[in-house]
Structure formats: structure tokens, C-alpha cells
Amino acid sequence: MHKINCGSAIGASSIALALAVSLRLIYNDLDMFKRIALKYLRCWAQKEERKPLVLRGARQVGKTTLVRLFAEEFEHYIYLNLEEKENAALFAADSSFEDLLSGVFFKANVRQDSKRVLIFIDEIQNEPKAVQALRYFYEKRPDLYVIAAGSLLESLMGRHISFPVGRVEYMALHPCTFVEFLDAIGEEQLACRVEQIAVPQSLHDYTLDLFKKYMIIGGLPEVVANYAEHRDMVRLGGVFNALLSGYRDDVEKYASKPKEQDTIRYILNYGWTFAAHRIQFAKFTNTSFRSADVSNAFRILEKTLLLELVYPQTSASFPILPDLRKSPKLLWLDTGLVNYVAGMQEELLFTTDSDELWNGDIAEHIVAQELLGATTSFGEKRMFWVRDARNSQAEVDFLIRYKSHLLPIEVKTGSNSKLRSLHQFMDESRESMALRLWNGPMTSDTIARADGSTFTLYNIPLYYAGQLSEFVGGKL
């Protein structure tokens, strides 16, 4: 592969060599737990009707590194970072697409008739005309492999950028999953077992302990790579601090008004402790911020993909219609960040109360992260169910949609755990199965409904949270 980085200056050879070796080591580490995304990229590249691909994801989920790894499979790689003015100028000029293409290939010293050329347009939000150009890559040069990404793409889309409808496709990139975490720390065989839902009972406690570490550390690639190399959670503090500083330093890019910036900063400083909780904008942390200001700040942060506000489903059947009048549940990008900011890592690491550990908000939050990480489709929303009838309130942690089925998921451990809300959901539903994630082994129970009919309750180890669609598909 001939790699041309149009956004890098040439320095002393010794420094360049050291940097290249360093980056290669980092990329090798990240490759271990981004192989799922690499599989998707390979499928995209093999499509006959291939469209330019837009990578969507929050900052620091590994978009740029992923594409660089993918580029190893191409003969030529052209990297255009539009944070650099000379690269942005290629697209900003009022010239034809043909002239633009000539400039890109000339700058990269690559012939236009070369085979298997991957062009990566990074930080594309810096030049709106580059977004418009994606249409012409699709219409005039479908032989080229074009990927675009941007660290603040989501927050800027609503203001400046409109992607060409029907001429691009999207891929979501999330923090690494438990399977990818296992790959990263050298547990490839166990990763395959988890992926295949085939962990033997003799490895149950060992796998659950690793899932606990994953729940504490989270899945941000830089954090996982650091832990994989050093196996030292204390060292991760500096990594988390740097990541948080980056998110907070971007506030001015998220919003231009001082009031918006102040509210966003407040949420980024104190909102982590409300992870997996339902929140009310009017009473959020008892501050003086107006409800409308808090709501707007959360919407802005949601566009950056740092968090998601999940509104409840109130029906136990289709259609899926989240009730926007009810309080949403707050889910952050990464459970490791939540633990670090809330100062909970040590407590979680050394707790001896298994039921308290696995029945808490953090267990629910890591399950939410796994449910989202199981898909590369952009725009997927997590779901939960509430029943607010007078004298009969209930809440099911999550719902999962599989084809024409809408199934409840409860995160609740202990052999004597009460599942009252799940039973209420199933009394209103005609589904034949329900799911409980717990710290015990894989089992199932036949449960009678109030009307005398029955359903099967599957008790599933927590470490299979990312494989629930495959599990359900094997049962229905």
C-alpha cells in the first residue's frame, strides 16, 4: 500500500521513524478491539453499488484510527485532514469536480487511473463544500473508495451541513464492546466464546469478573489500549482526565451563546452522576438554570453523541412511540467515564456485595452501552417501558426489537429477585419470551400470566448483553 498523508509535514528522519513505530503499536492495539467495525468496512468496500461512507460517532471513539487500519488493505491511501487550510482549500475553491479531483491526486502524487484508492476526508465539517463533493464522488467516480468523518460533525450538521440524500451511507462507531475488550487484553478465545454465546459453566465466574473490569473501565479505545498494555487502573486517571478535558474544551464549538455554554459546562461537570436515571429538566440538580435552557443544552450534547435522552415506551406492543411528555432516561457515551467522574471505580472494584454491584445503575448503564454497541446502524435508539397507571407504576429497564417482536429486558440479579415490572409488561404483551440479565448461569423458567397463558423467562449472564439479538434469533 502507498500511503500519502496530505496533512503532515516531513520532519527529521529519526523523529519520523520513531513516530511511525509508536503509531503502529497504537494502531495494532486498537485493531484488536475494532475488528467488528473493520468487518463492516470490508463489506462496504465489496458492494457493487457502493456510496461514500460517513462515519458517525463521538470524539475519541477511534474513527480516524479505524480508517488508517482499513487503509492497510488498499494500494493507495489519500488522507485529507480539513483542519489544515491547504487541504480545505482544495474543496473551498469554486472549481469543477474534475479540477478538485485533479488537485487531490496531484497533491498526493497518485495517478487518477490507479486501482483501489481509498480517500479519507477527515474533519469534513470544516468545509461544507467537501460535504457537497460527496455527491459527485458517488455519481462520477464510483470506483473510488471514499470515507468521511468529523469529530464535531453531529453538533454542526443542524446548522451548516446537509449531506446529499441518497448518495451517501452511514456507519455508527461506538466505544468498544465487551467482545472487543476481551480481544484487546489477549482473551481472543474467550471473546469467540462470548460472541458465539458458548461460554462453558466452568468459565462463568472468570468471564463475569472480566465483565466487571470492563464495566469499570468502559470502552473508549485509548483507555482500553492503555489498560491492555499496563493492566493498571491507576494509570487510567490521566487518560480519563485528558478525554474529559477535550470534551469540555469543545464547548465553544458546540454552542455560541454564553448561556448555552454555561449550561453545557454544568452538565459536563455534574451530569454524569445521573447516568441511567430519569431526569427532569426543571429540577435538574436543583440549579437556577431554566428548564428550557437545560433542555436545549442536553439537545446540543445529544447531537455530539456524548449522551442520549431515552424517552419511554408506554405500550407493550407496536408501534414504537416514545412518550415525549414523560421524563427521559440519561445515558452517557461511556460507562468508564461515568465511573471516573463520579469517583466510583474503587468502590466498584473492591465491593464484595454481588447483588448491590449487579443491581445498580452502573450495571444497567453498561448493558445500555452493549445494546448500542451491537449495531453499526446510525440512529439506533435504546428503549425502555413504563406504566404510569394510578396505583400501578412499573418500569422495565430496556426493550429490544427483533423483527416483529418487542421483548422486555430486566437487569436484576439474585435468585430471589422480584420482577414485578417485567410481569406487568408480559401481562399486557402477547410475546412468548422475556429476558433477564443477571450474574447467574444461563437458565429458563416457564412463567404463568394472570390470564393463565405462559411465557418463557430466559435468565442470561450479563456478559451476553451485546449478543441478545443473536440469542433471541436462535429462540424465535
Sequence positions of predicted segments:
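Conserved lysine of the Walker
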Residues: 63
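Interdomain motor-coupling "hinge/lid" segment immediately C-terminal to the ATP-binding subdomain
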Residues: 157-274
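Short glycine-rich substrate-engagement loop in P-loop NTPases that contacts/grips substrate
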Residues: 84-114
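Hydrophobic positions on the alpha1 helix immediately C-terminal to the Walker A/P-loop
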Residues: 66, 70
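Accessory nucleic acid-recognition modules appended to NTPase machines
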Residues: 228-395, 400
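Domain-level recognition of nuclease-like catalytic cores that cleave nucleotide substrates
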Residues: 442-476
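Conserved catalytic cores of phosphodiester-cleaving nucleases, focusing on short active-site segments
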Residues: 367, 371, 396-415, 434
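Pre-Walker A adenine-sensing motif
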Residues: 33-47
